[in-house]
């Protein structure tokens, strides 16, 4: 029922599955709130938003103000003080010489996760490739957890926080794929890690080629000593050789002839993978998945990258997420869902902490601006983006020229537009060869074979973007403004080749200007929105965090960026002296 003073259109509010579900936040994050509040006649109103913890104790209460008189739209914010469950209420009152009347909204839940749910730099590598050796006869000896451990300092030196591993479980033998996705594997082909399971075990086992369970535990500990969290792949599918196929045949789809149906995503066919049927033994599958998650959590894994969650029932994920949040609130789930917006958003509402996004395919100034505003404001209550520049599945068209400046500018965009971004190994070496023209698959894809890379040789020759990546991640760590999602403002430029935006958190104000043209120098005037920046004087001093240069800028700043110069000059990332 409408309260005595009607309070409507409250934002943020996330309605899903017949109830309000929690707005996403982290400890210390400030959440903007707005509501339409009306009263009959000409009475004046006061309004506030109050935040309560799970014990119904008020922990914050701030006024709401009608910034645009006549709109009846009241705006303000609250700050979440700690991890955990909270709820907020919008209150209004009006006092006249005759009476005092009040109104109060219903309760809107808020959940604050640990910081990594919002903030992080992610790196992906295949352990079997790290430390792999190409022998004199052309064969390749696989890397192991022991050899991959030697790569951890290099990943940490680039400033990454999370190391994501593709599946490390036993790989199926039946219908194993060969190099470049050929249907017939050779004797030395290692198989696709996502075809999980053979006689050595399934999702709860380690591929013996990589080592033992103890080797994995040692690897996780070594990563921690290097400041890295391990993100494990949770791929709910199997090879034809997985133990589940015999123990629980009801977990799979069967054709009319009684054979199990393999996975298909027309026109692609995955003869080496069986999808799961969640409808015939839902509780059994859920309990088994929870057992698997709990096992790896006990081994030190606190982050899971979930493979293709959009091909599984949304209510299944909501069930799993709710249970895990109660048991282990430190555990984070990233949705690898490159699919329709409604499904991606539903997965976020169901409980996924983060999601892959469309950033990989947003390249123009207009596309980047509109998409960044969407994820920062329209969907941020339930959908946290993680901007990946590439993945083993996606070699974007714009990278296929191999132009180092394009790799640099895309890294700048991904690492400064949102607080979480990711990069797949080889990006820093400018790997770009496509399997076929017009496609986004890598030539000699690491999904199907071991890739031997010469990290030291590339460093000695200066053929690596790693120092620049390290610089970007260091800037991110040093500046709170780049660790928030809901604080981005775009500023007009006179050229579509240059994009400009700002982010502010307290006294930390960062301006970013990027040349989107990797081949030619571009110059333009940037028209800074001084009110949005919170600067009340004409000229302001800035320091470029990429090259240390200090400059004096003004509301209409001419900027020239030449990608032919060192990679730092595909962009300005400047801190404003306040």
Question: Could you say what each language-model-derived stretch is?
Answer:
Residues 1-128, 132, 136-161, 170, ...:
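Carbohydrate-interacting/catalytic domains
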